[in-house]
Amino acid sequence: MKKVLLLLFVLTIGLALSACSQSSDASEKEKPKEKKSQEELEKELDKELKKGGEPKTKKDDQIHKIGETFKAGHTNFTVNKVDRVQKGEYMNVGGAVNEETKTIKDDEERLIIEVTMENIGEDSISYNFIGFDLRDKNDQSVRPVFSIEEKGRILMGGTLVSGKKVTGVLSYVIPKGEQKHYTLVYNPFLADTNSSNTEERVKDDIDYLVKLD
């Protein structure tokens, strides 16, 4: 659903940009190719929705590994390392304000995934943790968590100017010993939710996969 909302935002931006463009001279025989109208874009979105519930995101054709730096849209991305802890307390990201802390069970462990993002584009980007998704062998998403132990290191969100890097951690609770069956998915378009150049950034709507084995 979050992808649908983001795409609707793209439609709104596209309409605003079209309204601001100057009209061509009526006497000209050849006119520049016009941008699609909002109605046409909405029809395309509706078509995608009917196909599979929400517009399909492209998937990178490579499976990356821990320690590998690769280009993902307007960023260079690296999963530096993955640590495991088998005790301690945590809370769900996005949980209720009064939600109680949880304790790692005997058959569970918490993954602490350290990642680095580098902005290799010309414009600043606003990164956000919603651009990351941990999936199990059945392609099911795992809810992110946080612990006081990683205070100050959690990759929640911020602004990254051109040429700069940011390093932080993501955390998830999984069954003990099952790390090799999990994949971290990074989508630079979803991570950059506040870009001023949305039409360009939508090209970055690609899932990049990093196996955690």
Swiss-Prot record:
Cellular component terms (Gene Ontology): plasma membrane
Record's bilayer topology term: Lipid-anchor
A Pfam short name: DUF4352
Biased composition (Basic and acidic residues): 26-62
Keywords: Cell membrane, Lipoprotein, Membrane, Palmitate, Signal
Residue span of region Disordered: 20-62
Protein name, as recorded: Uncharacterized lipoprotein YjhA
